[in-house]
């Protein structure tokens, strides 16, 4: 008799957003005090964003990540003591080291399991989820906590309206458990380091604050062109790997960059817009947190149901991108 295949199954999800909500009108009024012109109409037309959550001073990535993790564990009916792997995807860690994952582990009271961060910017959660899937399939973990968390507001130039209106803070998490039935069906990760300069942020980190040249720099047109091209190809490749047709997808959960990219991608993939989970209007772009935040929102409001086929995609600085196909 052959050995039974082990799969990684998404057993629960959770999310946490900072209390402060900043509308486009409020942000426009604040920028106007520095003679920077923007408006709700301007932002919505170009991005689809209507508001964002911003962390108050002293609120760190590890705090957001821990709160999202607690909710995911509760949703999965899992105790922290059962977790033997924690992976946090973030570009805004509390420290250079120790990792944010180690801080989350301590906050949860978990001990002994592996804990580390991955940094792939807006692709980070997909990278982390694929990595955790490999651990579970290989028998190296039985219960993994995968988190995307960011305080991107700390690396924005609030005098640059082309970037500061785009981002928000938050965290999302999932619990992966080993199972005998297929959960994550296929995953693919990619990068092109020659495209580093189209989206980057320099600087040093100290307790969640960035020093040096801290600001995010982005070539928006280049990012748009690259993003829709690689996400289209990645979606087709990961579905082919799993033997699934795009038409079989129940939901597409892409990185929430802006609504233009989401709509363009849906058209290229011929996925109806009503099958695309969109939260960028209320969360803005939360980088590594965007995919798990969107996934959790759609699970909790009943859109995503057990047994459905979900494609999660990330794309971000590096340039990085990837896709994970899962049966919920």
UniProtKB/Swiss-Prot annotation:
Signal peptide: none annotated. It catalyses: malonyl-[ACP] + acetyl-CoA + H(+) = 3-oxobutanoyl-[ACP] + CO2 + CoA. Its main location: cytoplasm. The active site is at 122, 255, 285. CDD domains: KAS_III. Residues 256-260 are annotated as: ACP-binding. It is found in: Cytoplasm. It comes from the Bacteria. Pathway: Lipid metabolism; fatty acid biosynthesis. InterPro entries: ACP_syn_III_C, ACP_syn_III_N, FabH, Thiolase-like. Its EC number is 2.3.1.180. Keywords: Acyltransferase, Cytoplasm, Fatty acid biosynthesis, Fatty acid metabolism, Lipid biosynthesis, Lipid metabolism, Multifunctional enzyme, Transferase. GO terms for cellular component: cytoplasm. The keyword Lipid metabolism applies. Catalyzes the condensation reaction of fatty acid synthesis by the addition to an acyl acceptor of two carbons from malonyl-ACP. Catalyzes the first condensation reaction which initiates fatty acid synthesis and may therefore play a role in governing the total rate of fatty acid production. Possesses both acetoacetyl-ACP synthase and acetyl transacylase activities. Its substrate specificity determines the biosynthesis of branched-chain and/or straight-chain of fatty acids. NCBIfam families: fabH, PRK09352.1. Belongs to the thiolase-like superfamily. FabH family. Homodimer. The last Arg residue of the ACP-binding site is essential for the weak association between ACP/AcpP and FabH. This is Beta-ketoacyl-[acyl-carrier-protein] synthase III. It comes from Bordetella petrii (strain ATCC BAA-461 / DSM 12804 / CCUG 43448). The gene is fabH.
């Amino acid at each position: 008799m052959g050995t039974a295949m082990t799969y990684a199954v998404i057993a629960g999800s959770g999310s946490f957003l900072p209390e402060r909500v900043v509308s486009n009108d409020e942000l426009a009024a604040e920028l106007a005090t520095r003679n920077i012109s923007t408006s709700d109409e301007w932002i919505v037309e170009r991005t689809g964003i209507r508001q964002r959550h911003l962390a108050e001073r002293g609120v760190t990535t590890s705090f957001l990540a821990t709160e999202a993790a607690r909710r995911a564990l509760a949703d999965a009916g899992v105790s922290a003591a059962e977790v033997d792997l924690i992976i946090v995807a973030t570009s805004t860690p509390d420290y250079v080291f120790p990792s944010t994952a180690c801080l989350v582990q301590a906050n949860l009271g978990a001990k002994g399991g592996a804990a580390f961060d991955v940094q792939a910017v807006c692709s980070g959660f997909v990278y982390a989820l694929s990595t955790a899937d490999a651990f579970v399939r290989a028998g190296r973990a039985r219960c993994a906590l995968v988190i995307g968390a960011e305080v991107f507001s700390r690396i924005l130039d609030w005098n640059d309206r082309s970037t500061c209106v785009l981002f928000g803070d938050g965290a999302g998490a999932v619990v992966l458990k080993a199972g005998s039935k297929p959960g994550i069906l296929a995953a693919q990760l990619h990068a092109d380091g020659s495209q580093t300069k189209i989206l980057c942020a320099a600087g040093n980190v100290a307790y969640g604050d960035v020093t040096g040249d801290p600001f995010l720099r982005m070539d928006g047109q280049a990012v748009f062109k690259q993003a829709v091209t690689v996400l289209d190809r990645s979606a087709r490749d990961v579905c082919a790997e799993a033997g699934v047709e795009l038409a079989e997808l129940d939901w597409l959960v892409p990185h929430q960059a802006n609504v233009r990219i989401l709509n363009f991608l849906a058209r290229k993939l011929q996925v109806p817009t009503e099958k695309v989970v969109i939260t960028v209007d209320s969360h803005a772009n939360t980088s590594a947190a965007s995919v798990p935040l969107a996934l959790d929102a759609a699970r909790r409001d009943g859109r995503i149901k057990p047994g459905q086929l979900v494609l999660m995609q990330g794309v971000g600085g590096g340039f990085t991108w990837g896709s994970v196909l899962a049966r919920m």
